[in-house]
């Protein structure tokens, strides 16, 4: 009987404490980003802020010319620049170990979780405007390394109307 009363008391205490300090949930905010130059295009990039859950999807990469046909390895990196500090958001690498080549065009991957962007002091896309970059580093069959950089342009998809 005493165990039952203790269990009921603990349950009531836990239920009461979970309601205390409840804050209003942040509204869903969705942004798209893209960037391009003569050689590369990044498109369909998405950033989602949904309370503490954040999603960063790099979108797709399209190589515009034949200079990317002899690539044996490459890495892609999304990052922000704050002062002289480079803060990596998402980075992926691909290498062919058979002596062949790899295609740089395609899906750039994604990352999600609690504080995916806030861990690098990003609370809003205002912190990303003008500071979000994409970098492609390639190595060809002759061992020549090239680095390509694009600045991303952000567009808000959802409008925050306070509801």
Regions found by a protein language model. Give the residues of each.
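Sec-dependent signal peptide recognition
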Residues: 3-10
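C-terminal motif of bacterial Sec signal peptides marking the signal peptidase cleavage site
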Residues: 16-19
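N-terminal export/targeting and maturation segments
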Residues: 21-99
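Beta-strand secondary-structure signal
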Residues: 58-60, 75, 131-135, 149-151
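Short coil/turn motifs at secondary-structure junctions
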Residues: 81-83, 139-141, 157
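Short, solvent-exposed, Trp/other aromatic-anchored flexible loops in extracytoplasmic proteins
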Residues: 91-142
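Short beta-strand elements
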Residues: 144-163
